[in-house]
Amino acid sequence: MRPLQIVPSRLISQLYCGLKPPASTRNQICLKMARPSSSMADFRKCFAKAKHIVIISGAGVSAESGVPTFRGAGGYWRKWQAQDLATPLAFAHNPSRVWEFYHYRREVMGSKEPNAGHRAIAECETRLGKQGRRVVVITQNIDELHRKAGTKNLLEIHGSLFKTRCTSCGIVAENYKSPICPALSGKGAPEPGTQDASIPVEKLPRCEEAGCGGLLRPHVVWFGENLDPAILEEVDKELGRCDLCLVVGTSSVVYPAAMFAPQVAARGVPVAEFNTETTPATNRFRFHFQGPCGTTLPEALARHENETVS
């Protein structure tokens, strides 16, 4: 069997955020190795020794909080799937419809709270930090539930629902207004028969920087867009330094994030996957724990009997 060939980290920033891997890496990442272990006791031994832990999280973590994933057969908003709306072309063609979609998603988050998985991660970061150990979360989620749970060392590689970027001046700003603009009040209903609001572009969210007034867009990475090279540089540093990696609630099919954990595993670092099902990358990892993250993570990340807090 050929050894796994890892794409050089400098190439990661050149990859697109798509649903399929680049052709040159598709077969490399999914090579199957020995069946992973499901021994929590063995994982806990690795956890007890780890000084620099990276946790890569995906939609499965937030799904347990009731956050819509917009994936699979039921993943529709009106008659569209996320990949129909979360693109630069869709925004250029119909910014009103795209803003209705994101307004709906922002409003939904008002009633959602971090679950036991989010809380276990945040508590672990705080606890281990007092011991001089580092925990970093690299998330593909844009819902800010990790932040809400108390996670501080957080890299949101796909952006945030609660940040905007001006299409004219480029300013990125936090925005928690509800609604984000008056014209979106009461809009965004997800039912299939709902008609588009067709809001005039001048009434959509606008930049408040002096002298600008440009059209705002959600500060999220859309299909076909590159990830922020600065964030990916930070990701690369964390992946290169970690001595334990957890892959939590991610399908391992969205690139380039799907390459992160295999990159770590290839240098011999223990990687543990926590998911409700196996993924294309499962057999690349040392551990696999099947079940809801809100059930498996609290046990996995709980205080070890030999832990001491300075």
UniProtKB/Swiss-Prot annotation:
Localization of this protein: Mitochondrion; Cytoplasm, Cytosol; Nucleus
GO molecular function term, any single one: protein-glutaryllysine deglutarylase activity
Catalytic activity as recorded in UniProt: N(6)-malonyl-L-lysyl-[protein] + NAD(+) + H2O = 2''-O-malonyl-ADP-D-ribose + nicotinamide + L-lysyl-[protein]; N(6)-succinyl-L-lysyl-[protein] + NAD(+) + H2O = 2''-O-succinyl-ADP-D-ribose + nicotinamide + L-lysyl-[protein]; N(6)-glutaryl-L-lysyl-[protein] + NAD(+) + H2O = 2''-O-glutaryl-ADP-D-ribose + nicotinamide + L-lysyl-[protein]
Active site positions: H158 (proton acceptor)
Residues the entry annotates as binding NAD(+): 58-77, 140-143, 249-251, 275-277, 293
Alphabetized Gene3D superfamilies for the sequence: SIR2/SIRT2 'Small Domain (3.30.1600.10), TPP-binding domain (3.40.50.1220)
GO cellular component, one term: mitochondrial matrix
Presequence boundaries: 1-36
Binding residue positions for Zn(2+): C166, C169, C207, C212
Co-factor binding comment: Binds 1 zinc ion per subunit.
Entry keyword Zinc: yes
Cofactors (names): Zn(2+)
Keywords assigned by UniProt, alphabetized: Cytoplasm, Metal-binding, Mitochondrion, NAD, Nucleus, Transferase, Transit peptide, Zinc
Every Deacetylase sirtuin-type domain range: 37-307
EC number: 2.3.1.-
Source domain of life: Eukaryota
Residues that coordinate or bind substrate: Y102, R105
Assembly information from the UniProt record: Monomer. Homodimer. Interacts with CPS1. Interacts with PCCA.
PANTHER family: NAD-DEPENDENT PROTEIN DEACYLASE SIRTUIN-5, MITOCHONDRIAL-RELATED
Family that this chain belongs to: Belongs to the sirtuin family. Class III subfamily.
Comment, domains: In contrast to class I sirtuins, class III sirtuins have only weak deacetylase activity. Difference in substrate specificity is probably due to a larger hydrophobic pocket with 2 residues (Tyr-102 and Arg-105) that bind to malonylated and succinylated substrates and define the specificity.
Protein's name according to its UniProt entry: NAD-dependent protein deacylase sirtuin-5, mitochondrial
Organism per entry: Macaca mulatta
